[in-house]
Each structure stands twice: as C-alpha cells, then as structure tokens.
Amino acid sequence: QTPEYVMIMNEMIHDARIVRIDSAHVSEEIRKWLGDSIGWWEGDTLVIETTNFREQTGLLVASRNLTVTARLRALDGGHLQYSFTVDDPTVWTSPWSGDYVWVKSGERVYEYACHEGNYALGAVMKGARLLEGEAGSK
C-alpha cells in the first residue's frame, strides 16, 4: 500500500487487484479480468469502485455494465469488514449487496500451484522419470 495505490491479492492464482486512490476510471474500452478499480477514503473506510470488467469475468451473470462497489474497514485483531454492492442494470432489476469479515489468518501466502495437495504427484513424477530414462537408453 502506498498513498496512491492499494493492492488486494488473492492467494488463488495470485490475482492481484490494483486500486488507484483518488483517480478516475480508464476508458470504458479498456477491459480487464478483474475490472478497473479506483478508491477513495470515507473516514476509516476505503471505498473501491470497480468497473470495466471483461465480459468473460467468470461470474455466472454479468454484462459490460457491471459495477461493484466495495467498502473495507479495519476491525480489531487485524480483521477487515468487507461490504459490497453489485450493480448491473442489464442483468439485475436492482443492485444487491452482501458483507462478511475477512479474518486475519496469521499464515503466510504461498505460491499458488495446481499440484499442491495432489498426493499422487510423486507417482506422476516417478513415472515421468522412468519414461525419460527409457527414452534415453534407446
């Protein structure tokens, strides 16, 4: 975090959302997987408005008109209150909202790799080395 930027990183696939503080949105023709996020402070709450999502966002239902407004506020113990409102007048008849607490885990964020937790990976690698060895002896 700097005075001009806040980064929100998701451990899954290392998605990093860069929030530009006190800035304007980029041209609506520039579309990003995670949208274009700008933010500003309202007291102790960071308000983040995200627009310009790519149409292939991975969301079940969304259009080019999707706007997500989020509010982040620090709580005791290092936790964060996360509130959001989804507005897409092309898809929904009215905006809808939700909120939850991001609980501070105290754990490190590790590099995301699809093989983590795949206990068969050892056998897969052993088989690959065996095939490589056979190919090398020919």
Residue spans for each PLM region:
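Hydrophobic small-molecule pocket/channel-lining residues, especially in calycin-type beta-barrels
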Residues: Q1-K138
